[in-house]
Amino acid sequence: MSAADVDLRVFADYDRDVREETDVVVVGSGPCGAVVAKELTDAGQRVVLIEEGPPFTPAEYELDGPFSMARTMREGGLRTTLGTVIPTMQAICLGGGSLVNSAICVRAPDFVLDRWCSDFELPHTRRADLDPHYDAVGAFLGISPTPENVLGPRNLLFKKGCDALGIPSEPISRNVRGCRGSGECFTGCRSRAKQSMDVSYVPAALRGGAKVLTSVRVEQVVVEGRRATGIVGHVVTPFTGKPSFEVRVRARRVVLAAGCMATPVLLQKSGDLANGSGQVGANLQFHPGVAMVGVFPELVNPQFGATQGYQSLHFLRNGFKLETLWAPPAVLAVRMPGAGLALKQRLSLAPHSAVWDGIASCNRSLGSVRARRRGLDPKLTWNFHPDDVPILAHALHTLARIFFAAGAKVVIPGVHGIPEELHSLAEAEILRTRAFRAGEFVTASNHAFCTTRMHGDPRRGVVDELGRCHDLDGLYIADTGIFPQCPSVNPMWTGMALAHRTARHIAAGG
């Protein structure tokens, strides 16, 4: 941020309690909240945008993956679920997850939107309804396919393998301008090419007159009668969360965009608000991800090239999406089998390796988000449905086929109970023929949804398709929690499109 952004407050700026009165208060500066803030300031509304985390500048980014996670992620990046254990990371910084994600932008496929409309009574959430909002967000962020000159070998080998097998694939569209292919998305883009919210929508909202309060934890939604009228929280010390000055914002409308885990906790902590349907915190869904390492005879140097630059959407109706992957070596090493000398030998192969992953759509695998007695970090429970487990095996088997078609000499599947290395297609058949249990896969997911789902029937959902809470006037939700089911693809662009629609509705007096 520049010095001209005088309405951006950081921790050092607070020396007393904060009192604000505004048209709209938006809780959460991630992709959805930032869109709402910018669109409403464009419409002439007074907006206060609140973020619990601090802002980061490129000089503050840390290439050390675990250290970066400890600073930018909730619970130090070590959040997991009960039940079927799955690690999941949510950001705590200005810009939210957009600061540390791979900038992947994919529109939800038609079959997903059609299912949402028919199964959840959402008649105006079809392709024709959402495309204008996708288009508006895409134009603002410069969303476009990854150009070949920044793909690097890791991404091009994926294309080579898919082409050899006749599997359709494509460059991933991303919200970047002038990407250099430095592969540092996970720890923050030092070149500022990635159009994360802190360099795109938030500055635009500031230029439009928004006030942005960072290092403020919202703890309660204030309600008068049947109407939400503001929020209460505290200034918190970055990285420790120690509270100090009280913050009160009175507003004509409250928009919760804190993410599908923090938003339901905030509602629960506010007296179980907006829960006439019983759906607040219910229906937690993930995109469980599995990754495979392939080792090639030639140098790959996987640290070079767009972090995630190529994908195949061919298997979406089979329940999974395939894509390339990169992250700091210390993060990826967690997925490698072995210990001691064996692990060191495998890690020494990194210059010849590529990592690709599959994300699974698991609509039968459900969980919940519940507030703990103290603090705002949630109690997460999630269970893998047995009928969803074969999707992971199918994804890994397909990745093995692509790796060998691209020329890999060995793949490392990261699955318990089978060989640590597979050296041929014949050996990889075990991924197709064996019956697996969920706990045998090394999975993770940062895509989470559905905990405040939208539904046309107030008895079965928290909000309507415009993000309006059924139970309270003046309260809106704009994050991936309103998805009725998982979107089958990376969720950011769909969340932003829905948030754009919600903002336009509010601006029109809704």
Regions flagged by a language model, labelled:
Residues 24-49:
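N-terminal Rossmann-like FAD-binding beta1-loop-alpha1 element of flavoenzymes
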Residues 67-146, 357-361, 365-366:
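Redox-cofactor-proximal catalytic regions of oxidoreductases
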Residues 39-42, 46, 53-58, 62-63, ...:
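Glycine-rich loop(s) and the adjacent beta-strand/alpha-helix scaffold that form part
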Residues 1-24, 42, 500, 508-510:
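Extreme N-terminal leader/targeting segments of oxidoreductases
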